[in-house]
């Protein structure tokens, strides 16, 4: 809900003068892009730092003094980094591509909510985003056991959302462009 309301407020107040439907796509690319940088980039930096500490034999400088749950958590991170392979990288890239497509799609839907002053589109964007979070929640709860299945479900949901957003994008009319002669007459 937070992201969709944030998009709504951005389109409504901060980006008022951006009225072209392409601006919705651009906003979605920026929103999804910064999220991808933060999620993948910071995770990669963390994994590289852990791998460097392990490879240099310096990990003890971090683990010394840790006890119980703290030590278990650090050891779990080390094990995760050690087992990280190409399949994990592919899965992460696929997840971000799906998320990026979703951000663009939801930006178009929210843009239409602002442009046509129809709050129902904002509600729909919130509902679609919530639905998109269900497979990951089911995985976390142990209902789904395969990250590949989660990504496949997300892909299906994302493609449906993208098809709907494309329809909404095409339905949006471009604002009338004021020509130089129109401005001179005013």
Positions of the model-derived regions?
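Hydrophobic alpha-helical segments at protein termini of multi-pass membrane proteins
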Residues: 1-186
């Amino acid at each position: 809900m937070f992201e969709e309301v944030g998009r709504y407020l951005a389109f409504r107040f901060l980006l008022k003068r951006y009225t072209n439907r392409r601006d919705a796509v651009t906003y979605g690319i920026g929103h999804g892009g910064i999220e991808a940088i933060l999620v993948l980039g910071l995770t990669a930096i963390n994994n590289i730092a852990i791998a460097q500490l392990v490879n240099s034999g310096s990990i003890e400088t971090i683990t010394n003094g840790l006890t119980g749950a703290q030590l278990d958590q650090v050891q779990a991170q080390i094990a995760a980094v050690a087992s990280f392979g190409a399949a994990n990288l592919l899965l992460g890239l696929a997840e971000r591509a799906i998320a990026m497509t979703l951000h663009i799609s939801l930006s178009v839907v929210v843009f239409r909510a602002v442009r046509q002053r129809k709050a129902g589109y904002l509600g729909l964007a919130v509902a679609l985003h919530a639905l998109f979070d269900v497979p990951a929640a089911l995985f976390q709860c142990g209902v789904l056991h395969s990250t590949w299945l989660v990504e496949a479900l997300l892909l299906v949901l994302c493609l449906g959302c993208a098809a709907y957003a494309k329809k909404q994008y095409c339905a949006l009319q471009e604002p009338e462009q004021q020509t130089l002669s129109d401005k001179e007459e005013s």
